């Protein structure tokens, strides 16, 4: 790191242009129709169910890591520290659970969408309720937040006005994904992950090395721990000002499980990749690969935020960066500027790679969300209620149109998110108002045969006012605890309502679960145990 002029050099622009050309080229190549055929709905929405494990795993991470992580989680690293990494490290365990216990049931049912599974297990009414919810969530929360945070990064790094940045990112994602569907998204995701890891590693290495000075990278880590010991605590106590965001041990045994199980197990734009795998075994291998990658993500996105905190707190380090150090300076109120601020000081060429990584994080997530929004609207709304007799060609075109409309709406709303502070925490908190109720429906629907459609509908509808009550009641409570209590409340409501209908009989649509469904091969088991051992070591080191 050094005193670098604001913006990108010609070399950086060329590096980024090469990245853009590769992504668009691969996307268009994969998108082409086979000679004499047109894309079917399975081709467009599930990549023809042909994905190998490594493509599934890479695409899961590319869909997951977005501006929400690079910008939002780095901002939380600046404000909170390594404790925010629990979202990533606990996700690794969650992925293993999803791969072993949830995925076999979904693939056995041969579904396109999560709402479709809801109809098979419950009824059309609940499916429609959840389909509308997910479409709204993807457009008004996920797409808008990724566009806003990505636009914020471009504005900080290049000085491009926020609205133009948002429109540029939207157009980029649309160009390579709209025609080819999930195939284009997944195969470009494989390339995106390479840039994500490389760019994230470069930023982390150079930021920490700058702190270490002539003593090197490891000395930089040691200096960071000495300068900000509170930023290297995984479990926060009640005296910590960030306890309400990450409430101590409850992170490991409470509400974070709600957020992770919902996100990785029942989130359309995540689970869609596993549904597109060649087989259950390939999907499970892909999930383990993604779990391994989750172990390293905090070192790519959280550590730079902590480094930015240490640098901005040290007058000598700030002075050595020159006058540009005061440009777009992060603070407690503007923590999300931490990562873009760091990129100002990267050497020529490296900045281009990091900028490509940031763009990869943003556009891969945008493309994933667009494809999933289109899939749910087309298969669960349009085909169900508007045109049941539509053929594959018509449905694929409807999906493309739905993606464009969703993106236009998100672009109009995204600039309104300005001034939300720690965007990552904001997104988790407001998604957490609805995720516990949905998780309760799926957990009981999958594993308790007495769960009825009436119980599920009443439970999920009742969960939202209960969650709002916990959020706005006079006695403050960490939002992770709110999620856990909302989950338990919803499960009680569902169970009570279901039993009041029929206390003895199973629901006719109940799923018969046998132990043979959850048998995994030796490689999956070895990898799963290895990941859990690594997690135990990490939490022991940073407890």
Curated annotation (Swiss-Prot):
It comes from the Bacteria. It is a multi-pass membrane protein. Gene3D superfamilies: Sodium/glucose cotransporter (1.20.1730.10). Keywords: Cell membrane, Ion transport, Membrane, Sodium, Sodium transport, Sugar transport, Symport, Transmembrane, Transmembrane helix, Transport. One of its GO terms (molecular function) is D-glucose:sodium symporter activity. Its main location: membrane. One of its GO terms (cellular component) is plasma membrane. Actively transports glucose into cells by Na(+) cotransport. This is Sodium/glucose cotransporter. It comes from Vibrio parahaemolyticus.
């Amino acid at each position: 790191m050094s005193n670098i002029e604001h913006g990108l050099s010609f070399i950086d622009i060329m590096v980024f242009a090469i990245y853009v050309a590769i992504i668009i080229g691969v996307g268009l190549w994969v998108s082409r129709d086979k000679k004499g055929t047109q894309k079917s709905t399975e081709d467009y929405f599930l990549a023809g169910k042909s994905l190998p494990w490594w493509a599934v795993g890479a695409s899961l991470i590319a869909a997951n890591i977005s501006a929400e992580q690079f910008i939002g989680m780095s901002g939380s690293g600046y404000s909170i520290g390594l404790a925010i990494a629990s979202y990533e490290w606990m996700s690794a365990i969650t992925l293993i659970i999803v791969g072993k216990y949830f995925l076999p049931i979904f693939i056995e049912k041969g579904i396109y969408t999560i709402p479709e599974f809801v109809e098979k297990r419950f009824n059309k009414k609940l499916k429609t309720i959840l389909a509308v919810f997910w479409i709204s969530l993807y457009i008004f929360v996920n797409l808008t937040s990724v566009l806003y945070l990505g636009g914020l990064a471009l504005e900080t790094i290049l000085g491009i006005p926020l609205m133009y940045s948002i429109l540029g990112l939207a157009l980029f994602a649309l160009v390579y994904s709209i025609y080819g569907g999930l195939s284009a998204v997944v195969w470009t995701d494989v390339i995106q992950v390479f840039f994500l890891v490389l760019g994230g590693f470069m930023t982390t290495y150079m930021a920490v090395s700058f702190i270490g000075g002539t003593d090197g990278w490891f000395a930089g880590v040691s200096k960071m721990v000495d300068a900000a010991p509170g930023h290297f605590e995984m479990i926060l106590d009640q005296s910590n000002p960030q306890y309400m965001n990450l409430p101590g041990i409850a992170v490991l045994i409470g509400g974070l499980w709600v957020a992770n199980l919902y996100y990785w197990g029942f989130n359309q734009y995540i689970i869609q990749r596993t549904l597109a795998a060649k087989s259950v075994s390939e999907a499970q291998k892909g999930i383990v690969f993604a779990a391994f990658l989750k172990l390293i993500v905090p070192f790519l996105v959280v550590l730079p935020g902590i480094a930015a905190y240490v640098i901005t707190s040290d007058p000598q380090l700030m002075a050595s960066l020159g006058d540009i150090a005061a440009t777009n300076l992060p603070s407690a109120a503007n923590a999300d500027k931490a990562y873009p601020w760091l990129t100002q000081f990267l050497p020529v060429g490296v900045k281009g790679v990091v900028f490509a990584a940031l763009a990869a994080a943003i556009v891969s997530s945008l493309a994933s969300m667009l494809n999933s929004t289109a899939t749910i609207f087309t298969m669960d709304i349009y085909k169900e209620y508007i045109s049941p007799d539509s053929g594959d060609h018509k449905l694929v075109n409807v999906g493309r149109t739905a993606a464009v409309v969703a993106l236009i709406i998100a672009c109009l709303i995204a600039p309104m998110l300005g001034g939300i502070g720690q965007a990552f925490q904001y997104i988790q908190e407001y998604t957490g108002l609805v995720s516990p109720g949905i998780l309760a429906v799926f957990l009981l629907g999958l594993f308790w045969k007495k769960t009825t459609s009436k119980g599920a509908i009443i439970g999920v509808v009742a969960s939202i006012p209960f969650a709002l009550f916990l959020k706005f009641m006079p006695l403050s409570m960490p939002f992770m605890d709110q999620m856990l209590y909302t989950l338990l409340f919803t499960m009680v409501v569902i169970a009570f309502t279901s039993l009041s209908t029929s206390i003895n009989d199973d629901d006719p649509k109940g799923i018969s679960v046998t132990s043979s469904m959850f048998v995994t091969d030796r490689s999956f088991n070895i990898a799963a145990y290895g990941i859990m051992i690594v997690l135990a070591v990490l939490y022991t080191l940073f407890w």
